[in-house]
Design a protein with these regions (language model features):
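Metalloprotease/metallohydrolase-associated module, dominated by Zn2+-dependent proteases
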Residues: 2-15, 51-108
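Active-site scaffold of zinc-dependent metalloenzymes
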Residues: 4-30, 34
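Short alpha-helix carrying the canonical HExxH Zn2+-binding catalytic motif
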Residues: 33-46
Length: 108
């Protein structure tokens, strides 16, 4: 995991973004935020399992589906299976050691 800090690469309303093998953070102080970094590490694992391009295709398709379903961009984002897995487990710093392959499917 390579961390890059840049205010200009992160969309408004977000603190981090992962594009394997990089984690982009908006604020330098977040390099010490274990919960945020664990959230992004979960996304790295998801991207490794699916390969990067299929991950983002699935992500975009599921976001579009959730946007139609919820009619709210924030609700759509929070209900993407990848995000649900990451948010549900970000505080468990041992989660990735026990995580099953394609675990995000349980969040569909």
């Amino acid at each position: 995991m390579l961390i890059i800090v840049s205010r200009y690469l992160i969309p408004k309303g977000f603190r981090g973004f992962t594009f394997f093998p990089f984690v982009f953070l908006k604020y330098r102080k977040d390099t010490a935020n274990e919960v945020l970094l664990n959230h992004e590490k979960i996304h790295i694992q998801q991207q490794l399992e699916m390969l990067v391009v299929p991950f983002f295709i699935w992500y975009l398709l599921e976001y579009t589906y959730r946007l139609i379903q919820y009619r709210n961009s924030q609700d759509a984002y929070r209900n993407i299976s990848f995000e649900r897995e990451a948010y549900d487990n970000e505080k468990d710093l041992n989660y990735l050691k026990l995580r099953s392959f394609w675990q995000f499917l349980k969040k569909l």
